[in-house]
Amino acid sequence: GASGQALLRRLATLEQQGVEALFGEPALQLEDILRTEADGRGRIHLLDASRLVHEAPKVYATFLLWLLAELFEQLPERGDADKPVLALFFDEAHLLFADTPKVLQERLQQVVRLIRSKGVGVFFVTQSPADLPDEVLAQLGLRIQHGLRAFTAKEQKSLRAVADGFRPNPAFDTLTVLTELGIGEALVGTLED
């Protein structure tokens, strides 16, 4: 029926973006990225997806959803732990949500929300928080915001929204601080005091 046709169209789009090359790659083993040193220290793994992000963003989003879903399914519940089992940093995170089908965005948001209980920290790195969906921003336990500049009315509105995302602090005006931060300086906000 209609849903079958929609699925075929989506598969055709992924195929046009080169998804078959992704399936031809050696399998990513989660044990490899979860392995620690003998003294308990973690390892750093860099997955360079820069080409994939720009040439096939839907394939990139699909891969990340698969990775997060696999971690969610395979890792046991941990609750609040002293240190995470894994920390994932997604650079150019706005590309995960730009032009991605709504159903994929919703699934990404759901998995990101639930995966914290498995000991996985997810960090979204982007030039502007306004580029991320409100549903994702609402889940952030930690915000590290470098200085923002706003020249147009749209940028000023976006800046106010970013400032409003921080808990109020009587010691300073968040909006002013965000525009005055220098190179290497950042405003840090947490859910807890």
Task: Specify the residue positions occupied by each region the protein language model found.
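P-loop NTPase motor domains
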Residues: G1-Q110, T179-G182, V188
